[in-house]
Amino acid sequence: MGRHTDVERRTELLDAVVAHLAEHGLADVSLRPMATAVGVSVNGLVHHFGQKDDLVVAALRRVNDVQTEVLGRWLIRNPGLSQADLLRRWWRWINASPANLALVRLGIEAAAMEATSSGLPGVVRADQIAMWRHEIEQRLIGEGVPPAQARSEASLVKAMFTGLVVDLLATGERRRLHQALELGLARLEQIVWASAGLSEPAMPATGRR
């Protein structure tokens, strides 16, 4: 029972840490103000997570887990959802609340920061990109895209999403970015259709919702 309670407490603290990082970013992370913000002592944070860098790594993993859980629920409800439509839903989810956008921003921030600034190992920073790219790649292969092409297309799609999120953070111009997203996903759909030997779908109007 005590072990279960300890795990629950760790999860509660981790969610609070994620919320704090989502608001304040990864630059100049310090345990003392973070502990104050989440209502625990510095020793309490160290007890559950180890040193600062270990805590940030755990928080980033939690950020990814939250997003994969969202995607997983969509796929359980609709197993036949195409990769392009899954990405459309993901974009809508990102835009649904500032909290969702902040979670996605954390992964991009972690990937972009140098190790000297973040203290994060290179593999952790690379994983912020590689994990999502791999998921997209595997789903494209499942839709019939040849593996080598799926790898390249997944890299392109992940780069597109990263750029769209950065643009959104900087400009807030959702309509323009939605139109750009639809152009990119229409191209992806054409590739999937062509790989299946089907007629390519017509490019949608850029105002598609």
What are these language model-derived features?
Residues 9-12, 16, 20-58:
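Helix-turn-helix
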Residues 12, 16-23, 70-74, 106, ...:
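Solvent-exposed, amphipathic alpha-helical segments
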Residues 58, 71-104, 153-157:
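Hydrophobic alpha-helical connector segments
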Residues 61-68:
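Short, basic, alpha-helical segments at the C-terminal edge of helix-turn-helix-like DNA-binding modules
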Residues 79-80, 116-118, 128-154, 190-201, ...:
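Hydrophobic alpha-helical bundle segments that form small-molecule/ligand-binding pockets
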Residues 85-86, 98-120, 126:
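Amphipathic alpha-helical segments used for helix-helix packing
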Residues 96, 113-116, 158-176, 188-198:
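Amphipathic C-terminal alpha-helical segment
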Residues 103-111, 134, 147-168, 178-187:
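Hydrophobic alpha-helical segments that form the core
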